[in-house]
Structure formats: structure tokens, C-alpha cells
């Protein structure tokens, strides 16, 4: 299997195993699905952290309003009584007024937090450091774990306007957000290797040959952004080791130069009493008894 190290810019994303015979069209779809799936899990986990702390999201027309304003406008959250966490709730006010403040109990909160940690670990960038490939099945597994945890804590479900439910139902609205800018739609997705775009009509073997043991770095990006920066000749870690090597060598040369500067003191011509001993005929006298 060919192993691809997928990057976005200079940032490592994940490892992916495939075959040299795979059409680039199919490869782009697979890698883009995993890339966007990992982003979705990050967004869900971010919202689940808020859910664990402050409860469900209020309706859009009530978000950001003070309690007095809500009372004055006679607004009511119809979902507050329906979507009650299992085991009761603990009130923890959301200072930004986005969630209703009825947080799950500590035991249910731990269920959400533990599941978030497990899901993020499954598709983490650290998997690449551990030489573990990420698959679309792993992304789906992580999503299912998160969905299951939410169902345990909120057996009656979440409001239709809650971002977590919208993510699970693929109805999320990311327009105008930073998270939306990170997403790469499949038709706009490109893969680059060695300064070349992998054309969708070709096969991977047209670029890397037929050796199934090949390892390459590919970069994913949106169409129209030009060629991404090529990989440096040596890695950052190798560069650090090289700099340390040259530093040690430089210190060794400095020490040698210092030793050479004082080595003349041991020379015969530098001995101020040498000429005197020659005239007195006492040069090279050995005091050791025979």
C-alpha cells in the first residue's frame, strides 16, 4: 500500500493508505471526506464542551438577550422543558447568553467529556506521529461515539436549532465563520505532490510509479489558491540536529585554537633559561640515578 502523509499547508493532518492503481478522482474524494470529517468532529466537540457546561442552546431570537429583555419581550424557550438532561440539571449561567444555563449533572458531564476525549484521540494529528493511518470508518466511529453520548445525556434529544444536532443531521450553517473557511468542498478540492497538482483524470501510479511501498507527502487545498509551498529538503527536527552538530564542532575548534595558542610555551625556544644552560654545559642532564 502507498502511504500518503496528508498536510494542509505546512501542518500535518493524517496518514492515509491507498494503492497506486487508485484513480486520483477517487483519492481526492476519500481524503477530502476524511479532512472535512475531522473538522466536523472538532466543531461538535467544541459545542459539546459548551453543552456540558451550560446546557442546550436557546432559540436564535433569545440569544444574547438579558433576562429583563426576554421578560419584557415575553419570549419563551419551548424546548427548555422538553430537552432536560438525564438525572436532572445544575444551573450554570452562560454569560454570553447563548445557552440556557441548565447544565447536566457532574456524572453526565463526565460522560460527555470522556467521549469527547476518546473521539478526538481517534482522529488526532498525533496518530500520524504514531504512524497510525486514519480512515473514513474511524471518522464515522468517532461521530457515532459523540452521537451516542449526547443521546445518553439527553434522551429526549436536542432542539433543532442546537449546533450539535445540526451537525449530526448535516444541516450546519457555517457561512461567515472561520470554521466555514476551513472546510474544502469536494469539487473544489485539490491534491498536490512535488509541486504538481494530481489531475483527477489520472491514476496515482502516473505520478509515483508502481511501487506499492512508496511514501509521499500530499497537500490538500482549495482550487484557485495556486501551488502550495514545497516541502523543505530536511525536516525541522533534522535541522535542529544539524545545528547542534555544527555548534559542537565549532566549540571543539575553539578549544583547539586555544590549546594551540599556549602550546608554544612548552617549546624549547620559549624557555628563557635554555641558552644559559647551554653555556654552562648543563643541558640535557638527567638526574635519575643509573
Curated annotation (Swiss-Prot):
Q: Which residues cross the membrane?
A: none
GO process terms (BP) = regulation of cilium movement
Matching InterPro entries: CFAP298 (IPR021298)
Q: Where in the cell is it found?
A: Cytoplasm; Cytoplasm, Cytoskeleton, Cilium basal body
Give the phenotype of cells or organisms lacking this gene. Answer: Morpholino knockdown of the protein results in loss of cilia-driven fluid flow along the anterior-posterior axis. Multiciliated cells show loss of coordinated cilium polarity with many cilia pointing towards the anterior instead of the posterior. The planar cell polarity (PCP) component prickle2 is uniformly distributed around the cell margin, instead of being asymmetrically localized to the posterior of the cell.
What Pfam families does this protein's entry cite? Answer: CFAP298 (PF11069)
Role played: Plays a role in motile cilium function, possibly by acting on outer dynein arm assembly. Seems to be important for initiation rather than maintenance of cilium motility. Required for correct positioning of the cilium at the apical cell surface, suggesting an additional role in the planar cell polarity (PCP) pathway. May suppress canonical Wnt signaling activity.
Family to which this protein belongs: Belongs to the CFAP298 family.
Protein name (Swiss-Prot/TrEMBL): Cilia- and flagella-associated protein 298-A
- The scientific name of the source species is Xenopus laevis
Amino acid at each position: 500500500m502507498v502511504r500518503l502523509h496528508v498536510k494542509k499547508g505546512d501542518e500535518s493532518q493524517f496518514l492515509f493508505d491507498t494503492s497506486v492503481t487508485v484513480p486520483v478522482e477517487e483519492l481526492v474524494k476519500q481524503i477530502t471526506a476524511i479532512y472535512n470529517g475531522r473538522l466536523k468532529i472538532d466543531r461538535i466537540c467544541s459545542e459539546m464542551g459548551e453543552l456540558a457546561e451550560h446546557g442546550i442552546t436557546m432559540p436564535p431570537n433569545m440569544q444574547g438577550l438579558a433576562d429583563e429583555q426576554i421578560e419584557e419581550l415575553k419570549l419563551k424557550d419551548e424546548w427548555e422543558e422538553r430537552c432536560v438532561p438525564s438525572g436532572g440539571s445544575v444551573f450554570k449561567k452562560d454569560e454570553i447568553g447563548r445557552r440556557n444555563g441548565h447544565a447536566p449533572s457532574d456524572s453526565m458531564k463526565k460522560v460527555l467529556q470522556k467521549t469527547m476525549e476518546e473521539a478526538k484521540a481517534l482522529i488526532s494529528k498525533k496518530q500520524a506521529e504514531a504512524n497510525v493511518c486514519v480512515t473514513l470508518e474511524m471518522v464515522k466511529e468517532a461521530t457515532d461515539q459523540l452521537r451516542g453520548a449526547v443521546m445518553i445525556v439527553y434522551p429526549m434529544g436536542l432542539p433543532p436549532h442546537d449546533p450539535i444536532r445540526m451537525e449530526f443531521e448535516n444541516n450546519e450553517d457555517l457561512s461567515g465563520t472561520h470554521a466555514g473557511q476551513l472546510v474544502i468542498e469536494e469539487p473544489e478540492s485539490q491534491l498536490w505532490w512535488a509541486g504538481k497538482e494530481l489531475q483527477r483524470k489520472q491514476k496515482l501510479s502516473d505520478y509515483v510509479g508502481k511501487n506499492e511501498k512508496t511514501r509521499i507527502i500530499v497537500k490538500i487545498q482549495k482550487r484557485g489558491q495556486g501551488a502550495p509551498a514545497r516541502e523543505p529538503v530536511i525536516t525541522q527536527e533534522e535541522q535542529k540536529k544539524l545545528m547542534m552538530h555544527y555548534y559542537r564542532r565549532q566549540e571543539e575548534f575553539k578549544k583547539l585554537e586555544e590549546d594551540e595558542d599556549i602550546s608554544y610555551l612548552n617549546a624549547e625556544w620559549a624557555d628563557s633559561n635554555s641558552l644559559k644552560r647551554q653555556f654552562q654545559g648543563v643541558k640535557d642532564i638527567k638526574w635519575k640515578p643509573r
